[in-house]
């Protein structure tokens, strides 16, 4: 077992570490099929060997060539550390700056086997959300961070540490870009080749920006989504006895089970990967499991009748579950489901993100690498069956929404019946959850703010929970609009119940949907608590990229923007640059995330609070921009809620001056002006 000191000493070369290959007992990423030419295979190998001196290249070349041909990528398994990968307390990292140690804390959390989906392939979540492309990059990055001073910035090119460059103490310590390819080459096919060559990487969202906090990171948003789906579609506040059916128990989708329990409904979640299902059950995120469809339906009926709170994991394909629910409806007249969605990794449907109903899990894993064309055909056939079952249930009082995972987009490409008559190209038969629910929340400036206590002490997290609750209660007492008060009340309920629901997996972290005012106030309160010693170590502030300003994604985050700019990425890019200018400790900008490669531009940040006045100033400045940027853009697109919020924010901050839109007063003016 190596130490953190050894881990940060660079690439171990003399002697080389033992090549232990792929580990047993942990899930592994599906085999990739980049279809490289012989010349491209040589280039991939040449690129990998750049990290190593000539005296070890011959030995490593044979290993790396075998990895490339066997797994479709060079992961450099020999250099996978033997040390336990987890978020160690910040004081244990051998660093010259606290900021660098905090970044190390976050990186190692992303690769913790309790957190990461495929830890040995450096995938945190989403099937292909990489932290790094290979283990040499990880080791070099840790070495650079251990040497970094307050007058250097580490530059990351899609997993590759380009090096430490001189900068000012107020500059970011780390700047990350992932997948920044020329737009004409941003196709799925090109990505597979470029990733195999080791020159780009799909960082998902918080995987490649080192800000993932386990499935808790999406629980709060899922709670708000299901809660508001009940309000909007069912007209109720209390979801007792209501059934929510969906799929996925992975790094992000695993949140659905916990969210169902928190909102008090019956959640039935299908998962084809037994390892993922067992992992969530052992972590207490899933109450019951079954691999019998008959038992699943019987248990669902029982819980529905008794109005139990239940999260039930079905080990099987969700298409079988949907088709069985149709069978029950057609034979008994009983509709057993009220709400439905899907969280398969449909952004990556042909390489392990979606498993076709016609095959077992192992059969699918084999076919996707041995015959990709046949596998794609089965996936698309399965998607058509999937949608057909949902369409039948939707003829009754059942409501389905797309969870921003490209499910309806891929279903459309597969020829499924998801078209909406008279709709634009961003709309389908069923709404995106952003269009009907989260879009208005974002427009009011609320989004998935989060923080991580780098001490690793649960008591520090408890202090932050108390501080956040007090901040929100004070905001309500000071007076807020009714729509904002509803958000605050939902968030107070969340933070009060967070500890009870054992949400922490990995680092001592908390997610809380908050607006600009709330984020700034919480940050200031936490920073003051660090200064006074109530919190023992620095706290990292961050957020999901899936936020007010962080992501341009026409089929998810910006799907409720209707002025034609939903396909433009100025907001996300400006956010990345603006955060860097205003005090972020690190920033990241990614291609892809959520809906998939080429469909999204998104970014995130990390901001280390250390109890200093400078940290408070940075938090005030950066967090204000990080929210107002997106609210201003949503206002300009014509969203009335965003208009109201940005006007209020300008009244409170004389330095903020935003261009406001004028509505066309008379629609006939347009028609008359364009008359032939």
From Swiss-Prot:
Pathway in which this enzyme or protein is active: Amino-acid degradation; L-histidine degradation into L-glutamate; N-formimidoyl-L-glutamate from L-histidine: step 2/3
Source organism, top-level taxon: Eukaryota
Pfam families hit by this protein: Urocanase, Urocanase_C, Urocanase_N
CC cofactor: NAD(+)
Alphabetized InterPro entries for the sequence: Urocanase, Urocanase-like, Urocanase_C, Urocanase_central_sf, Urocanase_CS, Urocanase_N, Urocanase_Rossmann-like, Urocanase_sf
UniProt binding sites for NAD(+): 126-127, 204, 251-253, 271, 317-318, 343-347, 354-355, 403, 594
EC number(s) per entry: 4.2.1.49
Modification type N6-succinyllysine: residues: 534
UniProt GO MF annotations: urocanate hydratase activity
Keyword terms: Histidine metabolism, Lyase, NAD
GO cellular component labels: cytosol
GO BP annotation list: L-histidine catabolic process to glutamate and formamide; L-histidine catabolic process to glutamate and formate
Catalytic activity of the protein: 4-imidazolone-5-propanoate = trans-urocanate + H2O
Family: Belongs to the urocanase family.
HAMAP family xrefs: HutU
Protein name, per record: Urocanate hydratase
Source organism of this protein record: Mus musculus (Mouse)
Lineage: Eukaryota, Metazoa, Chordata, Craniata, Vertebrata
Gene name of the encoded protein: Uroc1
């Amino acid at each position: 077992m190596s130490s953190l000191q050894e881990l940060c000493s660079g690439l171990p070369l003399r002697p080389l570490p033992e090549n232990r290959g792929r580990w047993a007992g942990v899930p592994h990423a599906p085999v990739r099929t980049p279809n490289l030419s012989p010349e491209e295979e040589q280039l991939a190998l040449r690129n990998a060997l750049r990290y190593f001196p000539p005296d070890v290249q011959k030995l490593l070349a044979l290993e790396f060539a075998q990895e490339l041909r066997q797994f479709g990528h060079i992961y450099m398994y020999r250099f996978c550390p033997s040390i336990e990968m987890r978020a160690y307390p910040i004081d244990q990292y051998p660093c010259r700056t606290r900021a660098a140690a905090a970044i190390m804390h976050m990186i190692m959390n992303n690769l913790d086997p309790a957190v990461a989906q495929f830890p040995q392939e450096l995938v945190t979540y989403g099937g292909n959300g990489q932290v790094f492309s290979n283990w040499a990059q990880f080791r070099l990055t840790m070495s650079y961070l251990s040497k970094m001073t307050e007058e250097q910035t580490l530059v990351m090119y899609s997993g590759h540490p380009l090096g430490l460059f001189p900068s000012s103490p107020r500059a970011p310590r780390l700047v990350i870009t992932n997948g920044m390819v020329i737009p004409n080459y941003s196709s799925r096919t090109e990505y597979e080749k470029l990733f195999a060559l080791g020159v780009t990487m799909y960082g998902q969202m918080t995987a490649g920006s080192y800000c993932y906090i386990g499935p808790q990171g999406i629980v709060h948003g899922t709670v708000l989504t299901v809660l508001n789906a009940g309000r909007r579609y069912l007209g109720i506040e209390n979801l007792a006895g209501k059934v929510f059916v969906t799929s996925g128990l992975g790094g992000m989708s695993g949140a659905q089970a916990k969210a169902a329990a928190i909102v008090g409904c019956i959640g039935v979640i299908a998962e084809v990967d037994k390892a993922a299902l067992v992992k969530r059950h052992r972590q207490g995120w899933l109450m019951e499991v079954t691999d019998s469809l008959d038992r699943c339906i019987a248990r669902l009926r029982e819980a529905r009748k008794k109005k139990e709170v239940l999260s039930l994991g079905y080990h099987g394909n969700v298409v079988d579950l949907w088709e069985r629910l149709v069978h029950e409806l057609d034979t008994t007249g009983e509709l057993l489901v009220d709400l439905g969605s899907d969280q398969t990794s449909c952004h990556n449907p042909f390489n392990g993100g979606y498993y076709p109903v016609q095959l077992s899990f192992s059969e699918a894993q084999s076919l996707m690498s041995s015959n990709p064309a046949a596998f794609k055909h089965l996936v698309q056939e399965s998607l058509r069956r999937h949608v057909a079952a949902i369409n039948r249930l939707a003829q009754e009082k059942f409501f389905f929404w797309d969870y921003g995972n490209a499910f309806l987009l891929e279903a459309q490409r597969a020829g499924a019946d998801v078209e909406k008559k008279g709709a634009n190209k961003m709309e389908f038969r069923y709404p995106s959850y952003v269009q009907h629910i989260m879009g208005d929340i974002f427009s009011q400036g609320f989004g998935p703010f989060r923080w991580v206590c780098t001490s690793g002490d649960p008591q520090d997290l408890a202090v932050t929970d108390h501080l956040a609750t007090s901040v929100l209660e004070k905001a309500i007492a000071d007076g807020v609009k009714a729509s904002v008060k509803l958000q605050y009340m939902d968030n107070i309920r969340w933070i009060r119940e967070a500890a009870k629901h054992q949400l922490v997996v990995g680092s001592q972290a908390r997610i809380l949907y908050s607006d600009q005012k709330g984020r700034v106030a919480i940050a200031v309160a936490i920073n003051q608590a660090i200064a006074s010693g109530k919190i023992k170590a620095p706290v990292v502030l961050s957020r999901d990229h899936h936020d007010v300003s962080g992501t341009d994604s026409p089929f998810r985050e910006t799907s409720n923007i209707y002025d034609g700019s939903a396909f433009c990425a100025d907001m996300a890019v400006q956010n990345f640059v603006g955060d860097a200018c205003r005090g972020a400790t690190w920033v990241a900008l990614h291609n892809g995330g959520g809906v998939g490669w080429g469909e999204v531009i998104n970014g995130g940040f990390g901001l280390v609070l250390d109890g200093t006045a400078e940290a408070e100033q940075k938090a005030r400045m950066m967090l204000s921009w990080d929210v107002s940027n997106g609210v201003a853009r949503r206002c300009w697109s014509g969203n009335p809620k965003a208009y109201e919020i940005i006007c209020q924010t300008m009244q409170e901050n004389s330095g903020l001056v935003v261009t406001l839109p004028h509505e066309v007063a008379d629609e006939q003016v347009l028609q008359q002006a364009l008359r032939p």
